[in-house]
Regions:
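Short, basic/aromatic recognition patches
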Residues: 1-18
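Charged, gly/pro-rich active-site loop segments
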Residues: 2, 77-141
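Short coil-to-beta transition motif at edge beta-strands of beta-rich domains
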Residues: 13, 63-66
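Short beta-strand segments
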Residues: 15-52, 68-70, 82
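A short, aromatic/hydrophobic, helix- or strand-capping loop or linear motif
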Residues: 21-23, 69-73, 112-120
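Solvent-exposed residues in well-ordered beta-strands and their adjoining turns
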Residues: 38, 51, 71, 91-93, ...
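Short, solvent-exposed aromatic-acidic interface loops
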Residues: 50-55, 107-110
Length: 141
């Protein structure tokens, strides 16, 4: 699925995303993550990077069903802040986390450029999310 320009702008605006994975017992596991948008021949993917094999990584490897919410910073004239809700299918890729985190740090936490990720960071993991459905409140629905 290809996201529209407004959804792309929100993702690139330096706002956090909330990622929901499923624990083995079916209960939700919620994490705040940084995501970047990457275009592939099959459509857009959201990519989150992790230096360690956190629970969200283990959960997504076991059950790839995930949901993300990205909340806008400005509600404009609306009564509710716009938000982008995405359901998708995750796949875990080993390696590549430092490069993605370096790019995301420039937008999300520029004061840490050159400091995060650390130079000796492990290769880590990428969560690559194929977008199955887009909802929320905003010009992307």
């Amino acid at each position: 699925m290809q996201l529209n320009d407004q959804a792309r702008a929100l993702i690139g605006a330096g706002v956090n995303a909330t990622l929901v994975t499923l624990n083995a017992d079916g209960s939700p596991q919620v994490s705040v993550v940084w995501v970047e948008l990457q275009s592939t021949p099959d459509g857009d993917e959201l990519v989150s990077a992790h230096l360690n094999e956190h629970k969200k990584v283990r959960n997504a490897r076991r059950d790839p069903r995930v949901a993300l919410t990205i909340i806008g910073a400005d509600r404009g004239t609306e009564s509710v802040v716009p938000y982008l809700a995405i359901t998708g299918t995750a796949r875990i890729v080993e390696g590549g986390a430092p490069a993605v985190l370096t790019r995301l740090t420039e937008v999300m936490a520029p004061e840490f450029n050159g400091k995060f990720p650390p130079p000796d960071a492990p290769p880590g993991f990428l969560t690559r999310i194929t977008i199955d459905k887009v909802t929320g409140i905003g010009p992307w629905t």
